[in-house]
């Protein structure tokens, strides 16, 4: 296991330096932690101080964590629905929390488990469903880890351009969410003398001006010189933010992408696909909103990589079926 840990550690450092805008950053970090944990197992005896410091918290996290996370999702979903309205997109954290509770109930409720075990067709459906749940849970862990690493351990780099991504308007004014992105973008711009601010965002059907124009007006009020602001007002989604902004950027110039924390990793993966030399900064948002929005971003990432996700799941499902056939 120590060799697996060293291999994962070396690969993790390599990915961190060479190309961190990938899910492999999260995969390697998780494998590194798991292999380090496994390497320590033979050396820690129960009871001992190291057992209580290392293993007991992990055991508690694995046993209580799923229930706590499900309840947290439900609590934050009620906050979101109360403060932001009952739109379908605001029910994602509620659905995740409720689904988590139902799965925990099916595992812990003896009569339900026995009912499923004695009906072969139901057991097959339940097994397939749980394989999907396990797969997407692991993917969510990798996605979350890669996201956190991309906005918490950003190497300080020189940016020639600071690209701020739009996020909807209130009439012709920026929302608090969008204002936080612009404020963060201005902060990054001020730390990079000679850089240009790119405001990227199109005009929705219910908006009187484009997001980019409203963002520009906000930045001007904050004291940013007009000659340092570039407007890109054709984009309708994150991929178009990258694609259309690229035409305004000198080839090979380093770009700092600024968006909300929950949106940053997927934005960086799209920037990589559009061959932008980029790194990212996250703007703060309220946690009740971030949790639901992060789930939406995860779904967006799954759709963005759907071919690879389907292929990977089918391979793992086949491996599981072969294993069950050989050892059952």
Language model features: what each stretch is:
Residues 1-156, 253-254, 258-328:
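Extended hydrophobic blocks
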Residues 118, 122-123, 138, 144, ...:
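A structural signal for short, hydrophobic/glycine-enriched beta-strand patches
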């Amino acid at each position: 296991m120590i060799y697996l840990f060293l291999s994962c550690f070396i690969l993790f450092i390599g990915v961190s330096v060479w190309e961190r805008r990938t899910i492999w950053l999260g995969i390697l970090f998780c494998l590194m932690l798991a292999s380090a944990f496994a390497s320590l197992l033979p050396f820690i005896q129960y009871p001992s101080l190291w057992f209580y410091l290392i293993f007991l918290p992990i055991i508690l996290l694995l046993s209580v964590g799923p229930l706590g996370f499900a309840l947290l999702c439900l609590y934050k979903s009620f906050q979101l629905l109360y403060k932001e309205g009952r739109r379908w997109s605001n029910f994602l954290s509620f659905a995740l929390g409720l689904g988590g509770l139902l799965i925990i109930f099916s595992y812990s409720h003896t009569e339900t488990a026995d009912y499923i075990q004695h009906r072969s067709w139901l057991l097959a459906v339940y097994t397939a469903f749980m394989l999907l749940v396990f797969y997407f849970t692991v993917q969510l862990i990798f996605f979350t880890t890669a996201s956190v690493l991309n906005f918490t351990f950003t190497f300080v780099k020189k940016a020639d351009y600071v690209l701020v991504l739009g996020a909807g308007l209130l009439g012709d004014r920026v929302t608090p969410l969008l204002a936080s992105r612009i404020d963060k973008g201005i902060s990054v711009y001020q730390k990079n003398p000679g850089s240009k601010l790119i405001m990227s965002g199109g005009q929705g059907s219910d908006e009187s001006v484009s997001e980019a124009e409203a963002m520009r007006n906000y930045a001007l009020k904050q004291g940013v010189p007009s000659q340092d602001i570039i407007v890109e007002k054709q984009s309708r989604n994150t991929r178009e933010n990258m694609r259309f902004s690229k035409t305004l950027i000198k080839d090979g110039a380093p770009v700092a992408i600024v968006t909300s924390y929950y949106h940053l990793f997927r934005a960086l993966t799209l920037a990589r696909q559009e061959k932008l030399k980029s790194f990212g900064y996250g703007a703060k948002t309220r946690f009740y909103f971030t949790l639901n929005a992060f789930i939406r971003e995860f779904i967006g990432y799954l759709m963005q990589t759907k071919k690879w996700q389907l292929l990977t799941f089918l391979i793992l499902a086949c491996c599981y079926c072969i294993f069950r056939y050989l050892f059952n």
